[in-house]
Regions:
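Structural signature of WD-repeat beta-propeller blades
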Residues: 79, 88-91, 174-177, 185, ...
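Per-blade loop-tip surfaces of WD-repeat and WD-like beta-propellers in eukaryotic adaptors/scaffolds
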Residues: 130-133, 154-156, 193, 198-229, ...
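Beta-propeller domains
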Residues: 21-91, 95-166, 194-225, 267-271, ...
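Canonical WD40 repeat/beta-propeller blade segments in eukaryotic WD-repeat proteins
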Residues: 87-94, 171-178, 236-244, 283-291, ...
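Residue-level detector of Asp-centered blade-edge/turn motifs that repeat once per structural unit
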Residues: 94-97, 106, 180-183, 246-248, ...
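Blade-level signature of beta-propeller repeat domains, shared across WD40, Kelch, NHL, RCC1
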Residues: 438-465
């Protein structure tokens, strides 16, 4: 049913099992028979085979003498970052460094919101990640001896850099989204205290680029902390649904746990006018919102009520729901992503299923694609901005899965016995983080993904995409 078709390189699992076995050396007597020598050679070959790393699949039990090692040859780039308090949500900020950047070292800007131990300790973080070099190592490099001095100097030069600017934020940041608007960069934040606020983060982005500006900003913010451009307190409960319209600058949609969705529009006073009449249709918490990538009045939402709804904001709020996929998942629907180039929406739920919906037959047909790999609720899903058949999903099973829906199984392909039950569309499994909450593809850095988890951030690019 998919319009895409192309060949794709073999899928890769970057984690491998390494067996930590003792080496047994037996000295042979000079009078050993030829058959004994042959037996010894066979045993040595068998032990060598046992000691070779094997591909690891999630939930595969490890023996006492086994541990996991990351295969660096599966990554073009892999970096980790810590922010102190973990971040439930973040967004990648578009910059002026150019599109389609592939030359290392790379630079990325993000805005994130913390989940601190106390509501008054939370911050919005404006972050610059720079000097991001390739970390690729061929398999044979692992066994080569280090040229210590040269390598240490080179490693020091290639250390990634991270620079922060902080904005104090009342309450945990449930979700945060950034947009460019009138020569400024704005961030909308959903607070656990029930407020949705819009911040101008242009000054902070300039500060992380210039040490002198950052020092001045930090001093000024002690007595004169940044204030939001606008704060909306009309939601009756906290929420998670939040998205800027990509085709109508400054327009925002926010959805709460009470089931209400409000549409924001910028006004001439430099703030926002929020329609106090919520969109009517859902019967439970709004979990995610996605505006159409090409129709400025159309958006999609998903909910704990297990429906996905398509809305037209030109209609009256009680008539704005135009299409509904009932019982789209067996449990709560957590996340959706609208493909930027094709009429498809991907959804992920508490049931661990990843569904793909064709908007041309949305209400009357089942999903055109269903994939079951995650063993726990899916927490994030996003289509690739460049390759329309590629998407990424993250789950509470501590996995990030990369998919190419254009791939079909080749009947003549030789498949490892351990991999034969995996969907052929599954390209790559990224692990190493605990409690992954959100992922985003970088629009300007092809193939680069940023993820946030309880254990911090990862920014990586695989050999598969």
């Amino acid at each position: 049913t998919f319009v895409w078709a192309r060949a794709r390189a073999s899928r890769v699992s970057p984690y491998k099992i390494l067996i930590m076995s003792e080496m047994h050396i037996e000295s042979m007597a000079s009078g050993s028979s030829e058959s004994e020598n042959e037996d010894m050679e066979e045993r040595e070959e068998s032990e060598e085979d046992d000691d070779r790393p094997r591909i690891y699949l999630p939930d595969q039990p490890l023996k006492e003498d086994e541990h996991l090692v990351c295969d660096q040859s599966a990554y073009v780039m892999l970096h980790q970052a810590q922010t102190g308090a973990p971040c439930l949500s973040f967004d990648i900020v578009m910059d002026n460094l150019g599109n389609d950047r592939k030359e290392f070292p790379l630079t990325s800007y993000i805005v994130a919101g913390t989940q601190a131990s106390s509501p008054h300790l939370n911050n919005i973080l404006i972050v610059k990640m720079s000097n991001l070099h390739s970390t690729y190592k061929a398999l044979e490099d692992d066994d080569s001896s280090d040229e210590d001095d040269d390598d240490e100097e080179e490693d020091e030069e290639k250390k990634p850099q991270m620079t922060f600017a902080f904005i104090k934020h009342q309450g945990c940041v449930n979700r945060i989204r950034a947009t460019n608007f009138k020569n400024s960069v704005l961030a909308a934040s959903w607070s656990e205290l029930g407020r949705v606020e819009v911040w101008n983060i242009t000054q902070q982005l300039q500060a992380v680029d210039e040490p002198a500006l950052l020092e001045r900003y930090n001093l000024d913010s002690v007595n004169n902390p940044a204030k939001p451009l606008y704060s909306f307190t009309g939601h009756q409960q906290e929420g998670f649904g939040l998205d800027w319209c990509p085709t109508e600058p400054g327009v925002l949609a926010s959805g709460d746990c009470r089931r209400d969705i409000h549409i924001w529009k910028p006004n001439e006073a430099g703030t926002w006018t929020v329609d106090q009449r919520p969109l009517v249709g859902h019967t439970a918490s709004i979990e995610d919102i996605q505006w159409s990538p090409n129709e400025r009045n159309v958006l999609a939402t998903c909910s704990v009520d297990r429906t996905i709804r398509i809305w037209d904001t030109r209609a009256a709020p009680h008539k704005a729901c135009m299409l509904t996929a009932e019982n789209a998942h067996e449990k709560d629907i957590n996340v959706i992503s609208w493909n930027s180039k094709e009429p498809f929406i991907a959804s992920g739920g508490d049931d661990g299923f990843l569904h793909v919906w064709d908007l041309r037959q949305f209400s009357r047909s089942p999903p055109v694609g269903t994939f079951k790999h995650h063993t726990a609720p899916i927490t994030s899903v996003e289509w690739n901005w460049i390759e329309p058949s590629v998407l990424a999903s993250a789950g509470e099973d501590n996995q990030v899965a990369l998919w190419d829906l254009a791939v079909e199984r080749d009947d003549n392909e030789r498949i490892d016995e351990d991999l034969k039950n995996l969907p052929p569309q599954l390209l790559f499994i990224h692990q190493g983080q605990n409690d992954i909450k959100e992922l985003h593809w970088h629009k300007q850095l092809p193939g680069v993904i940023v993820t946030t988890a309880h254990t911090g951030f990862n920014i990586f690019k695989t050999i598969s995409v």
